[in-house]
């Protein structure tokens, strides 16, 4: 047996995680095309047709998952690149990775499905090379957009669509739990996806809080229903809004699908996004700092991933007590989608309230459109909610509603409780003489006559 020492320059200690995962990049290339810092690699031509690669994985934080360590990322990428090149781009040689260290390999790169052995601080993998190729063609961080906005993306799309022996099983998925407050939102979401001529399945995970009547409406809207037991967020406060948000982890149990795009049920889709299924897990849009927003993301369902997430949920923290904080600690190496794939309805500049016309989706933060009158965005009636107010975005949601069959519209009915709340805050807005003047708008919403 012949062995080689693989030599490569260690990445500079000056390179920090935030350099690889900046909060913002110039997606439109208005001033310059975004570039990622270089992570040195070996001279790969010197190490061809290896049967196995053995590496010691660095670990700054022993026993803590989600370590944002640039050197750790470098070692994992070196091993992945060596394996892909040794396996060959057009052949399927068996190659193995042996990774040693207390922190273990980065599971974003080395899939648990490919693991042959794990004993203490030793991991052995026989990777599926086509999957690994997709990973190494990605930028080294969220410092650049990937597919399909670059030649890399075209290569991945080509590999992904032509080398698999079967048509990938793909679906959009959302989750409803704990109450029926978002049933209307989920119906509108399904209808909006259908209105873009999507060809993918629609799957909705629902717990026991969703009534048979609502399930009937959700099915009629296009969702395939799968019943689930909700999962409590171990770091959330009792009765907090995100107390049961870990129920989202159930999407990793959808093993009937190769990939799913999760979308929160207070979204509406305005442009077809089927092409984004060509991205690998975990792809999402940026949020604050180096974290991603879990409102829209692509994942690859897997029994072992779900089991690992469930096991780690008590050990790994969450900055916000909910699923987004937890998932950002579990998937520290993620891929940036364009921000227009998750356009947040929030405005820091009060003068400009229109969302971009080319937005793929809109995330309706604040008071939801179906809890307001059709006539205007009721976020205007509360000073603390005005950052979420946009009449144009509100109108776009109601355009989706108007295209829905009449039988589905009843699930978006205005309840007496909703009406009373709106009237209460309209009166307060009038008394305060709020300058936007929306409280002056005559109400013509016909839903007021249905209760």
Segments and roles (model prediction):
Residues 1-188, 305-306, 312-451:
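A glycosyltransferase accessory/donor-loop signature
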Residues 6, 205-207, 226-230, 286, ...:
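Conserved beta-strand termini and adjacent loop/short-helix elements that scaffold enzyme active sites
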Residues 158, 212, 221-236, 240-303:
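GT-A fold catalytic core of metal-dependent nucleotide-sugar glycosyltransferases
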Residues 200-202, 258-259:
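Short active-site oxyanion
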Residues 2-5, 112-117, 219-227, 281-283:
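Active-site regions of enzymes building and remodeling cell-envelope glycoconjugates
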Residues 97, 202-203:
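Hydrophobic/aromatic residues located in beta-strands of well-ordered beta-sheets
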Residues 206-215:
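Glycosyltransferase specificity loop/lid
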Residues 192-199:
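Short, acidic, metal-binding catalytic loop of nucleotide-sugar glycosyltransferases
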